[in-house]
A protein has these predicted regions:
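Short low-complexity stretches enriched in small and charged residues
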Residues: 14-22, 59-62, 90-93
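Conserved long alpha-helical elements within nucleotide-processing catalytic cores of c-di-GMP signaling
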Residues: 28-30, 34-49, 53-61, 67-86, ...
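Short, internal active-site loops enriched in acidic
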Residues: 66-70, 141-144
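Short catalytic/binding micro-motifs of nucleotide second-messenger systems
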Residues: 51, 86-91, 120-131
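Short, low-complexity N-terminal regulatory "tails/caps" that precede and couple sensory modules
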Residues: 1-31
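A short glycine-enriched loop-to-beta-strand structural element that forms part of the catalytic core
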Residues: 60, 96, 100-107, 129-157
């Protein structure tokens, strides 16, 4: 049973003799939300950029931040991550990038990113915590752009949309 819980949480059972069990994080998934961990997300991003350059497809990243003036507990983060998983397509890479920051990598243009983001936000306004809000931004990959400049441009988009 412990082994199954560890696998679901993104951990690997290292040793399990008697009542003493130790777990190690697998580095691929966030232990709380079961979404992709940042290193795994950035590796997927690099692969998708290479694929986009070869196949001339559109690639867009959406960055979502959960905001609240009150403390956010683990249950809220888990339900937020579950809603991300259920609101976006199966083939979209979804990750927890920071404490309250999430990233979604989609194959599609900005119109699709806007449509999927609005659908997610409307569902969170119904199902989510009343004291929390969601900010988001998206950026479409430009051919020949490096992964770091792509992510930096996404950060700039979020700053332009925010109130700071």
């Amino acid at each position: 049973m412990e082994r199954m819980r560890a696998c679901l949480a993104g951990s690997v059972l290292i040793s399990g003799k008697g009542s003493s069990m130790s777990f190690a994080h697998d580095g691929l998934h966030d232990q709380l939300t079961r979404l992709a961990a940042p290193p795994h997300f950035y590796e997927i991003l690099r692969r998708e950029i290479a694929l986009t350059n070869r196949n001339f497809t559109d690639l867009t990243v959406i960055r979502v931040i959960l905001n609240s003036n009150l403390p956010l507990y683990e249950a809220t983060l888990i339900s937020f991550a579950d809603l991300i998983t259920n609101s976006f397509r199966y083939e979209d890479a979804k990750a927890r990038l920071g404490e309250f920051e999430f990233g979604i990598l989609i194959r599609g243009d900005e119109a699709l990113a806007e449509q999927l983001s609005r659908r997610f936000i409307s569902r969170w306004s119904i199902d989510g915590t009343p004291d929390s809000t969601v900010s988001y931004a998206y950026a479409k990959y430009s051919k020949g752009e490096s992964a770091i400049s792509f992510i930096n441009r996404l950060d700039d988009q979020l700053l332009l949309k925010s109130d700071f």
